[in-house]
Amino acid sequence: MKRFTVCCFSNKIHKNGDRNPDKKSRESMEVSRKDNEEPEKQNNNNVASIIGSDRTNVIVNHDFSSGMHSWHPNCCEAFVVTAESNVSHGVLDPSKCGSYVVVKNRKETWQGLEQDITNRVKPCSLYKVSATVAVSGPVHGLVEVMATLKLESQQSQTNYQFIAKTCVFKEKWVRLEGMFSLPSLPEKVVFYLEGPSPGIDLLIQSVTIHRESEPELERVTAEDETIVVNPNFEDGLNNWSGRSCKIVLHDSMADGKIVPESGKVFASATERTQNWNGIQQEITGKVQRKRVYEATAVVRIYGNNVTTATVQATLWVQNPNQRDQYIGISTVQATDKEWIHLKGKFLLNGSASRVVIYIEGPPPGTDILLNSLTVKHAEKIPPSPPPSIENPAFGVNILTNSHLSDDTTNGWFSLGNCTLSVAEGSPRILPPMARDSLGAHERLSGRYILVTNRTQTWMGPAQMITDKLKLFLTYQISVWVKVGSGINSPQNVNVALGIDSQWVNGGQVEINDDRWHEIGGSFRIEKNPSKALVYVQGPSSGIDLMVAGLQIFPVDRLARIKHLKRQCDKIRKRDVILKFAGVDSSKFSGASVRVRQIRNSFPVGTCISRSNIDNEDFVDFFLKNFNWAVFANELKWYWTEPEQGKLNYQDADDMLNLCSSNNIETRGHCIFWEVQATVQQWIQNMNQTDLNNAVQNRLTDLLNRYKGKFKHYDVNNEMLHGSFYQDKLGKDIRVNMFKTAHQLDPSATLFVNDYHIEDGCDPKSCPEKYTEQILDLQEKGAPVGGIGIQGHIDSPVGPIVCSALDKLGILGLPIWFTELDVSSVNEHIRADDLEVMMWEAFGHPAVEGIMLWGFWELFMSRDNSHLVNAEGDVNEAGKRFLAVKKDWLSHANGHIDQNGAFPFRGYSGNYAVEVITTSSSKVLKTFGVDKEDSSQVITVDLQGL
C-alpha cells in the first residue's frame, strides 16, 4: 500500500524524571508540522468583547486594523506599518503582506508588545494561541520569539506562564502556536510577545487566542469514551506525530507476516535515533487533574535484529510554570513475534498547560509498531473483601517428618543428583526467632539431613507443600543449617520456595565456620499454585549441607500485637501527675477530670514528591496524619544536578517550604548513593581528581544551602549494596563524607541507610554485617548518629523484625524505619502487614521514628502498597493506619484527689484536660508530656474556675 509519513520538528527541553538519573536533554514537540511554513494573511474579523463562542478571538484588534488600540509596548516603542503609509520594514512590503506592527528600541529580551486579556479568559479552559511574527535589524541566524502570560495578584508575587516559542529568520513571517490553561483566574492576565535579543525589532502581523475546550467542570463525556483522537488510525495519521522521528502507516509489513491485531492498519515509529523517540499525540485539555486514567496500547517491535525490548507509555506534562514532568505510565516486554497489550494508569496532580502521551523505549534503530492507543477514565476497582481463612492452625508445622523421627528421610526428596541421609548432632533447641513465635515447644530431635555429592549450588533436600498452603496466611520459616568442611570462602545457604515458576526467598544466611546457624524468613501466597515445593540450597558444589528442624508454620499476628501493646505501655508511656493549683483545694477536690491526648510526639512521616504538593487532597491527608517528611527524589544528586553545573533546588525548596510552614520536620535523603546505577553518567566519566572535587562541591552546596533545615541526612545511601565512590576514591571517602557533612551542618543527625536489614532475606545486609559496617565507620572517626532501616518488606513476621532490632539496638544509636512499605493485592492483608510493622517499631525501645515510603496510589515505588486510592478514597490499609495512630493516643478519666492531683499514664505528646466541678463549672487546659522514663509532674492553673 501507499505509505504516509509524518515528521516532527523539535526544540530541546530537559527531562526531570526519576526513571532516568542522567536527566539528559530530551526533545519534545514544540513546533507543529507547519510551523516553518509561511502562513496566509489572516483576515477574520475580531469580536472585541465577550468570551461566549469558542471561536471568538480573545485578542482585541488582532490584526492592528485599528492601529495600536488595546496594545501596549512593554518598556519600548511600537508603531503600525500599513500600505497607505508608504513605509516598509526591510523586504516586508505592507502592500503585499498587509499591515503589521513594529516593536523597536528594545533594550531587554523581555520587552515586546502586550495586551490585557483579564476579562476575556476563563479558568480551567484550554486556549490556543496563534501569532504571525517576524524579526528585523541586526539578526544573525535564527532568533527565538516567545508568547508569555503575566499573572498578577496583590496577595502574591507576579508569575509568568510560558506558552510557546518559535525560531524566526530575518524578515520572514513565521507562525508561533501554543496552548495554555489557567487553573484559577488571577486579578490580572496580560498576554505578551517577547524574546529577540536587544536591538532586534519584533514584527507582529496578527494574534489570535481561541478557546479550544470548555472548563473541565462543565465538560461531560462518556466514561468509556477515549480521549485519544483517531485511536485505531482509521483516519490515517491525523492527530499523530513522530517524537523526533518519522511515523508511517501500514496495512502490513515483512512481506505480509505482520498484520494488524485489529482494524485495517497500524503505525510504525521509524528512523529512531534515541530510546525516547516514538509516536505521540497531544491530549492537552482532555485530561482532568486528580482523576485516574487508564491507557491501553497494542504494540510490538520490528527491525535492527532486536527480538525483544522494553516498550513504555509515557506522559509528558508541562506545568504553567514551565516545569516539565515525565510520568511513566507502564512498561511491557514487547517482541517482534506478536502484538502485546500494554496497560497502565496515570493521574495529574496539578494543572497542565500541555500534555502529550507517547510510546517509547526500544533501542535506536528498532521500530515501534502501534496498532491502537486508548486513554479512558479508569473504572474504580471495588475493595477486596477480607479473606476467609478456615482453621489457620497457628504454630503448626506443615512439613512432613521435620524431626526425622524414624531415622529416615521419608517425605523428603533430593533436588538434583545429591544424596540425602540422616545424621545425629544438631541443636535440640528451637532457633531463637521460632522460639519467640511458638513459645513453649517440644525440643528438637537432634537429627539432621546430611546432603552429600552435591555438584550444583541448588542441590539439597526438598518437599512438596502444594496442598498444605492457604491463601493470604503468613508463614514463618525456621531452620538450623551448617556446611561441611573444606570451605575457603563464605557460603550462602538459602531456604527457597518454588511457587509454580516463581522463586520465593524464604531466608538466607552467610556461613564461614563450622557452627550451626539459624535461618528465619517468611512468605505468603495470594493465588492458588499448581505446584509448590520448599528446598534448601546454597553452598558451592562439592560442599556438604546439613539441615536440622526445618519448620514452616502460620503466624498468629493478633497474639503478637497484644504482646506489643503491653510492651508499648512499658516503654513508651510514662507516669504523669497533674497538680491543680490556683484556687482553694476544697473547691475542686472531687471534681471530674477528662484527659485526652491530641497528638503523639512519636515521629510518623512519609515520602512526598514535588508533583504531590500540587494536589490539595494529598496535602490535606499529609498534613493531618504525619509530622515528618522525606523527599522521594528531589534532594538526590541526580535530581539537583542532572548535568554538571546545572543545579536545580527549586523542587526541594518548594517542598521544604510546605513542610516548614506546617511544622513538619524533614529528613535529608540522600547526599550520595553508592549504587552505581543511580550515579549520573557525567560523574561516572570523571577521573579521580575531578570526582573528588565534585563530591566536595556536592557536600558544600547542599549542606550550606540547607544548614539547620533537615534534622537528618542519609549520608551515603546503601553502602552494603554499592561501592561506586569507595571503588573510585578509596575506603576513606565514606568516613570523609560523614566528617565533612558534620562540619558543614553540626545540627543534623547523620544516618547510614540500607535495605533487607530486618527480613532475613539478604546475607549482604544482615544485622551483623550492618553492625560491622557502622562500627568500622565510627572507629575511623565518622560521626554516625543514626541507623536507617528502609523497611521495604514482604509478609512481615514480628519476631524476625524484632531480632534484627535487638541486634542493632546494642549499638545505642537511634533506629528509624526510613522507607517503610508493605504490599498485598488484598487491602485487609496489606493492613495487617502495616499494623505488624508499626507496632514492632513502636514497641521497640531503640526505634525513634517511622517514615512511610508514600501512601497515595500511583505514587508508590511498589504496586499494591498504597493507603489512599488515587482519587482520594482511604482504603482498608489506610483505615488501619489511622486506627493504629489512634491507639497511640492516651486518654484518662477520673477525679481530683484530696491532694489536688490526678495521676495517669500516657504517651509523650500534646494533651488537653477538662475539669468539671460539682457546680458544673468547666475549664479546659492544654499541656505536654515529654519523652522520659521517670514520672512527670505538671502544674495546671485553675485560677478563675
Curated annotation (Swiss-Prot):
Pathway(s) of this molecule: Glycan degradation; xylan degradation
Subcellular location: Secreted, Cell wall
GO cellular component terms given for this protein: extracellular region; plant-type cell wall
Spans traversing the lipid bilayer: none
Record keywords, A-Z: Carbohydrate metabolism, Cell wall, Glycoprotein, Glycosidase, Hydrolase, Polysaccharide degradation, Repeat, Secreted, Xylan degradation
Region (Disordered): 16-50
Glycosylation (residues): N86, N239, N305, N349, N417, N453, N687
Domain GH10, chain residue ranges per copy: 589-884
InterPro entries: CenC_carb-bd (IPR003305), Galactose-bd-like_sf (IPR008979), GH10 (IPR044846), GH10_dom (IPR001000), Glycoside_hydrolase_SF (IPR017853)
SMART domains to which the protein is assigned, alphabetical: Glyco_10
GO molecular function annotation: endo-1,4-beta-xylanase activity
Job description of the protein: Binds to and hydrolyzes insoluble and soluble xylan substrates. Exhibits xylanase activity.
Name of the protein described by the UniProt record: Endo-1,4-beta-xylanase 1
